A protein has these predicted regions:
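Residue-level preference for beta-strand/loop junctions
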Residues: 2, 47, 62, 93, ...
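Glycine-rich portal/gate segments that line the openings of hydrophobic small-molecule binding cavities
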Residues: 25-29, 38-90
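Short, highly charged C-terminal tails/helix-capping segments
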Residues: 34-35, 141-150
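Beta-strand/loop substructures that line and gate deep hydrophobic ligand-binding cavities in soluble
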Residues: 80-138
Length: 150
């Protein structure tokens, strides 16, 4: 299985970033250019829940939507999804993503937001999901600006 990851430092406590990420109403307002809507189709965010992400115009040339099944939740810290439908599922099988929010040592008002993907390309010519990584990191960076209005 191949892996790719990236991270950004956020100027907020990990708990706040976690709450923003897990709340469909809030996450849909953070950066509609990248993520226009999120809904739990089944469940409430626990393992086994299905969450549908509708992507915004900033990434719709690459991915329009992604249906994800929550596999693992470490409360307040990380959530792991397996993509079970949408454009990414056609390019990679499996495609598993983990979003983590980790407090920085010595400063409880900052955290490290990490995106990690584990994947297998569906075809030999399929490139690594660099566009997905870049979009996810841009989205995570948007948390800082949004929190000022939240």
């Amino acid at each position: 299985m191949k892996m790719m990851k990236g991270q950004v430092v956020l100027n907020m406590p990990a708990e706040k970033a976690w709450e923003m990420y897990r709340n469909n109403e809030i996450i849909s307002k953070i950066n509609p250019e990248l993520l226009s809507r999120a809904d739990y189709i089944q469940g409430d965010g626990a393992p086994g829940s299905l969450r549908l992400f509708k992507l915004g115009p900033g990434v719709s040339n690459y991915v329009k939507e992604s249906m994800e099944k929550i596999e693992k939740v470490v409360s307040g810290r990380s959530v792991t999804y397996e993509v079970i439908g949408g454009d990414l599922k056609e390019m990679y099988d499996p495609y598993r993503v983990t979003f983590s929010f980790v407090p920085t040592q010595g400063n409880s008002n900052k955290c490290i937001a990490e995106w990690k993907a584990e994947f297998e390309p569906s075809a030999p010519a399929t490139p690594p999901p660099e566009q997905a990584r870049d979009a996810a990191l841009r989205f995570l960076e948007s948390f800082d600006n949004f929190q000022l209005s939240y």
